[in-house]
Design a protein with these regions (language model features):
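Non-catalytic C-terminal accessory region of glycerolipid acyltransferases
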Residues: 1-14, 118-397, 404-414
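Negatively charged sequence features
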Residues: 12-23
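Short, conserved catalytic or adaptor-binding loops enriched in Gly and charged residues
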Residues: 22-27, 72-74, 100-103, 215-216
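Helix-to-loop junction immediately C-terminal to a conserved catalytic motif
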Residues: 23-53
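Short alpha-helical segments and helix-capping/turn motifs at coil-helix boundaries
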Residues: 31-33, 111-114, 151
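Hydrophobic pocket-lining residues within nucleotide cofactor-binding pockets
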Residues: 40, 53, 88, 169, ...
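Catalytic core of membrane glycerolipid acyltransferases/transacylases, capturing the structured
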Residues: 42-116, 121-122, 132-147
Length: 414
């Protein structure tokens, strides 16, 4: 049993991961742009509501989370807590390259109504995707078409009197361009493999070559922060006077009004920022800057880059290049045809930090994080003092990006 005050967020790991692995990928591969960050309050509680997209692994959520935190200087108290679907933790292949408890160590909390409520009551800034899985798995043919919004964030925003700040995610639809989903196949994947959907055709390639399950094309994502939405006022307009009572019908109408409002603004921002989703000239220029570590930046090198950073934190330095290569021999499974069984087998037979041999089933389960986390049973500790800052970081907030040179004239804003 995990004691009260369970906090899986690992800031030391995240800062090391950012410096050694992810910030170089952000800068030279994804090259994200953050517009309007000054509209986000420095303290919570608040809900940052973003559209979901990509028809792939949730790269849009990871890039947005990392971009926001870097903008805030990697300060502990400014780290958003992401509400994510529990399926991301229950099976190892839904964590990036099987990294133990990755989503929770990165600040995520299992998505359910009670957890969401407790996070806002705690004063957290919560990153939330109101479309859920249908948003990310809608297929390229429905790109930028917002799916039905959940009513949870409407109810809780009214109950806790917190602002909802929209974020419009542009170009993440091009993480897997021309990808599609089939309903019957998705239901089969959910039932057999606990995978919410299988994107086609890349998903079929990922069945053969495991590293392609985590593939992302170099979409230059742009995150545009919109003006706060006064959800409590919208709820009152629907005649709801007691937000403690869950009124699904009226809250659903408010959620639909918010969806339509965000859809109109999203369409506008796509016209401004979405004309060059990859911007290949910028990509080539950035990759040339890191040509000596080219493979570490590209998706084909991510299995090695991500996994070695994790393992190096709990093992002595390699005795040489050959030793460094041989001790991670199991990573070849990501590149072998049908390498999934080899990866699963080595996780069972190798000792930590490579696998779980020698650990009890309960110990391995806690390390992996493949359980449903309910804050009612395992609560977060109180938030630290807002004045405490992260020590030792040299990262400074990024300047707002200039508009693209080819920017079209923006329509008048209401």
């Amino acid at each position: 049993m995990i004691p009260q005050g369970y906090e899986p967020l690992d800031l030391d790991y995240l800062r090391d991961f950012a410096a050694r692995v992810y910030l170089p990928i952000l800068d030279h591969y994804f090259r994200p742009r953050l517009v309007g960050a000054e509209k986000i309050p420095a303290e919570g509680p608040l809900i940052l509501a973003a559209n979901h997209s990509g028809n792939a692994f949730p790269h849009d959520a990871v890039v947005l989370d990392a971009t926001l935190w870097r903008h805030d200087g990697l300060v502990a108290e400014r780290k958003f807590r992401t509400a994510y679907e529990k399926e991301l933790t229950l099976v190892w292949w839904m964590r990036p390259f099987g990294l133990d408890n990755f989503w929770r160590r990165g600040g995520g909390v299992d998505m359910c109504f009670d957890n969401f409520d407790r996070q806002l009551a705690r004063g957290d800034r919560v990153l939330y995707f109101p479309e859920g899985v249908p948003g990310i798995g809608k297929g390229f043919n429905r790109r930028y078409r917002l799916q039905r919004f959940s009513t949870s964030f409407v109810t809780l925003a009214a109950r806790r009197q917190v602002p909802v700040i929209p974020v419009y995610v542009i170009n993440a639809e091009w993480v897997h361009p021309f990808g599609y989903c089939l309903g019957p196949l998705n239901r089969l994947m959910q039932r057999v493999f606990t995978v919410p959907f299988l994107p086609l055709p890349v998903g079929l390639l990922a069945v053969v070559f495991p590293w392609m399950w985590y593939l992302s094309f170099p979409a230059q994502m742009t995150f545009v922060v919109g003006d706060p939405i006064d959800v409590p006022a919208m709820v009152r307009e629907e005649g709801v006077t007691d937000a403690a009572v869950r009124d699904g019908e009226r809250m659903g109408r408010v959620a639909e009004r918010i969806r339509l409002r965000m859809q109109a603004r999203l369409d506008e921002e796509v016209r401004i920022w979405g004309r060059r989703p990859w911007d290949l000239r910028s990509l080539v220029r950035e990759l040339w800057k890191v040509r000596r570590r080219f493979l570490a930046i590209l998706p084909i090198g991510w299995p090695v880059t991500f996994t070695r950073q994790e393992r190096d934190r709990s093992r002595p330095p390699a005795r040489g290049r050959l030793h460094a290569l041989l001790r991670d021999w199991d990573l070849v499974g990501f590149y072998l045809p049908f390498g999934w069984p080899l990866l699963s087998l080595t996780r069972a037979l190798r000792r930590p930090p490579y696998g779980y041999r020698g650990l009890s089933r309960a110990e391995a389960r806690e390390i992996r994080g493949d359980f449903v986390w309910r804050l009612a049973e395992r609560p977060l500790p109180p938030r630290p003092a807002a004045a405490e800052e992260a020590a030792g970081t040299e990262i400074v907030p990024a300047a707002p990006p200039p508009p693209p040179a080819w920017r079209v004239r923006a329509p008048a804003r209401p």
